[in-house]
Swiss-Prot record:
Organism: Paramecium bursaria Chlorella virus IL3A (PBCV-IL3A)
GO molecular function terms attached to this record: type II site-specific deoxyribonuclease activity
Protein name: Type II restriction enzyme CviJI
Encoding gene per record: CVJIR
Disulphide linkage map: none
Keywords associated with the record: Endonuclease, Hydrolase, Magnesium, Nuclease, Restriction system
Length: 358
């Protein structure tokens, strides 16, 4: 009896232990399910958050894209309006120039010298604004000048009646590199323009004279070119008819001085112009500033990068006689040569028949 009771007691204890283990396993499984459910809940929450942030990002990007597109359309509309204004202004200038031309009392053949174009340029530009005004000059590449304040008018400099004097003659006879000056309310010249006619290409500088203002290695480069040229002249010291030669210019200083004046590198002035411009004036108003551009080629002071291709300055020599048919003489190294003229010209003057030297 005692043995049976003892066996039942042991089996009961085993059953209790097994039941306890079963309950513990059940509890563990429940906790595992709870943990997995929590992880899934967190994953779903994070996914929802990610989707919401993605939607927000897409919405912001779309909003930005729409804003940029609206801005682009507005800028395009503005550009079209400005282009229409520019074309209307050009047409207005053309009509004004025709009126000026038709109002002349003298009906003789129109001269091709630069003075006529400069005179008309001044008349046209002065009819386009009421001063005092602030101007900024803008060249063909979009380079902008300093602000020029209190401009009331533009005037033709009397020295510009000389077509293309050398710098030495400019100084000696008050004939400046500048053709046109901007005048402020005190009557003082405050900005300077070298103007070229719209048609054709004019020389940058005559260098036939013996009193050149170049110095140092620049002077030596000019003289070296001259010596090379005259060595090609016959013994009679008469330059052959219709013979032209040219040579590239190495020195950027020579180019800048030929184009902008011999005071290049100093303050703007009559012999250090702010801008060289070709053709008629165009004025565009933005805010309180008037931006002056040209219908043709233009370059701000020092911007040699504008002078490429047909505008590149080169040494150039040609045959030349006076209007009366008399021989024109040039002195090189104390020797006089007939019908010979030295220039710094745009490369446009060079043809297939022009001989390159040096």
């Amino acid at each position: 009896m005692d043995i049976r009771r003892k066996r039942f007691t042991i089996e009961g204890a085993k059953r209790i232990i097994l039941e306890k283990k079963r309950l513990e396993e059940k509890k563990r499984i429940a906790e595992e399910k709870k943990r997995i459910a929590l992880i899934e809940k967190q994953r779903i929450a994070e996914e929802k958050k990610r989707i919401a942030e993605e939607k927000k990002r897409f919405a912001l990007e779309e909003k930005k894209r729409i804003a940029e597109e609206k801005k682009r359309i507005a800028e395009e509309k503005k550009r079209i309006v400005e282009e229409k204004k520019r074309l209307a202004l050009i047409e207005k200038q053309r009509i004004a120039e025709e009126k000026i031309a038709s109002g002349r009392k003298i009906r003789k053949r129109i001269s091709t010298n630069a003075t006529k174009h400069e005179r008309e340029f001044v008349k046209v530009i002065n009819s386009m604004f009421v001063g005092p005004a602030t101007f900024v000059f803008v060249d063909i590449k979009g380079n902008k000048s300093r602000e020029i304040h209190n401009v009331v008018r533009f005037r033709q400099l009397q020295g510009s009646k000389a077509k293309s004097p050398t710098a030495y003659v400019d100084r000696e006879y008050n004939k400046p590199k500048a053709d046109i000056a901007a005048v402020d309310i005190t009557g003082k010249d405050v900005a300077w323009i070298s103007h070229k006619a719209s048609e054709g290409y004019q020389q940058y500088l005559k260098i036939s004279g013996k009193n050149l203002k170049f110095t140092g290695k620049e002077l030596e480069e000019v003289l070296s070119f001259k010596r090379k040229v005259v060595s090609m002249a016959p013994v009679s010291k008469i330059w052959p008819a219709n013979k032209t030669v040219w040579s590239p210019i190495k020195s950027n200083l020579i180019k800048n001085q030929a184009i902008f004046g011999f005071d290049y590198g100093k303050k703007p002035g009559r012999d250090n112009v702010d801008i060289i411009g070709q053709g008629r004036p165009i004025i565009t108003k933005r805010g309180s500033i008037l931006y002056l551009t040209f219908t043709g080629f233009s370059a701000l002071n020092g911007h040699l990068e504008n002078f490429t291709g047909k505008h590149e300055p080169v040494f150039y020599v040609r045959t030349e006689r006076s209007s009366s048919g008399r021989s024109i003489t040039t002195v090189v190294n104390g020797v006089t040569y007939k019908n010979l003229r030295f220039f710094i010209h745009p490369y446009n003057f060079v043809s297939s028949k022009t001989q390159r030297i040096m």
